[in-house]
Amino acid sequence: MIKVAIAFGILVSAAVLMKKKDMSYRQSILKSIYPMIMWSTNSNGKKQLLENKNGATPSMSFYDLTMNAIDASPFNFSNLKGKKILIVNTASDCGYTGQYEALEKLQQQYKDQLVVIGFPANDFKGQEKGDNQNIAAFCKKNYGVSFPLMEKSIVIKNNQQNLVHKWLSDPSQNGWCNQEPVWNFCKYLINEQGVLVNYFPMTIDPLDPLVIAAIEKK
């Protein structure tokens, strides 16, 4: 425990010294301690994995859904037919915000077969207070995000939940899954035919072998 505390102190100090102009001190510290957060929570995350083991198919097509991208332009999900899609609810001030870096690496590694899509949301402890313009700038400057981002919306179950997360968490639409996001950076994988196949909690890193195996599965 003493070694962990010392390491934590070093990381925090380094984060303060190396703070970027476009990052708050909180954001800089969270980015620095992200590896420690993942180390401490990863084992629990594997208990929360969900998989479409029975091959359930949706009664409502995912490709019929539309939303606005973060720049307010219409985004048509039908254009993604034939590729896997990883949907992630995101936030800029979360302990898991460091996953942006891994998500971008994942997108680049599998760009011919996968599209990562971020859904900024302020649903958990007010950790995404910025507007769409600020969120887009933060992601680009600090993590080099090139994958699509949707406009800021609500991802948890209520009457304002965005249509995509309504589909992801309603078994009457997707065929089997009723799991809403429990925190920022929960991940849903949709296959090339528009079938929801996996749910990964925030405690599973985007580059975890479990995620990679699901993406590479034929």
Enumerate the language-model features and the residues they cover.
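Typically the conserved alpha-helix immediately C-terminal to a functionally engaged Cys/Sec
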Residues: G95-Q109, G130-Q133
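Thiol-based oxidoreductase modules, predominantly thioredoxin-like and allied folds used
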Residues: N89, Q113-G130, V145-N158
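Loop/turn elements at helix/coil->beta-strand transitions in domains of secreted/extracellular proteins
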Residues: K81-I85, K111-V115, Y143-P148, E192-V195
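Short, internal strand/loop/helix patches
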Residues: Q133-W183
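Short active-site neighborhood of thiol/selenol oxidoreductases, capturing the structured segment around
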Residues: F75-G98, L103, V116-P120
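N-terminal targeting signals for export/organelle localization
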Residues: M1-F62
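Thiol-/selenol-based redox modules, centered on thioredoxin-like
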Residues: L163-K166, D170-K218
